[in-house]
């Protein structure tokens, strides 16, 4: 009886190690793909949720994207501070279609993410910072001149999607 239990434990341990190795291989491949996309400086982020200053968290599952391509930032940020009590989301959008003045990318390996800092030409009153995890999850921080920040959560996607 003890031999059967020991045999079962060995089989479970071997299967567990194989599954963990397979998961780490998938994570490594995903991290390499994210690195290539970020370093190309051409990528899109699909916005999935928003967290405003009052810590109101909303899942929006929008079709809105933040696109960085060819030295431009094109974005439509829902639920921004243009109207705090909109009757519909279109009343509170912030649209940006501007050339990028500066774009800095830092690899923060200890945190498992890239930090992308963007300053745009017009409107110059906004600063956009993006944290892109090695797994493709993103946090986008948009700050206006009154220091109000809206945080968007999303997912990195390839630019041609």
Mark where each language-model region is:
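Short, low-complexity, polar/charged sequence segments that are solvent-exposed and flexible
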Residues: 62-68, 93-95, 134-139, 159-161
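Helix-rich interaction surfaces within compact, conserved domain-sized segments
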Residues: 102-161
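Bacterial Sec-dependent N-terminal signal peptides
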Residues: 1-28
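A generic structural signal for short, non-catalytic loop/turn and secondary-structure boundary residues
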Residues: 7, 14, 38-40, 133
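N-terminal secretory signal peptides
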Residues: 23-86
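Residues that act as N-cap/strand-start positions at coil-to-secondary-structure junctions
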Residues: 30, 58-60, 99, 112, ...
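A short linear-motif detector with a strong N-terminal bias
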Residues: 22-25, 44-46, 52-55, 81-83, ...
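Mature extracytoplasmic domains of secretory-pathway proteins
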Residues: 66-112
């Amino acid at each position: 009886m003890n031999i059967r239990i020991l045999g079962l434990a060995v089989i479970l341990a071997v299967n567990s190690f194989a599954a963990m190795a397979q998961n780490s291989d998938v994570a490594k491949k995903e991290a390499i793909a994210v690195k290539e996309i970020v370093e190309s400086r051409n990528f899109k982020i699909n916005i999935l949720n928003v967290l405003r200053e009052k810590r109101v968290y909303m899942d929006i599952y929008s079709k809105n994207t933040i696109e960085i391509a060819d030295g431009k930032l094109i974005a439509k940020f829902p639920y921004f501070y243009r109207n705090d009590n909109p009757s519909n989301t279109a009343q509170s959008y912030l649209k940006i279609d501007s050339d990028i003045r500066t774009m800095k990318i830092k690899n923060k390996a200890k945190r498992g993410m890239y930090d992308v800092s963007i300053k745009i030409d017009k409107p110059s009153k906004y600063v956009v910072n993006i944290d892109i995890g090695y797994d493709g999850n993103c946090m986008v921080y948009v700050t206006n001149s009154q220091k109000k920040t809206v945080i968007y959560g999303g997912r990195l996607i390839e630019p041609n999607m």
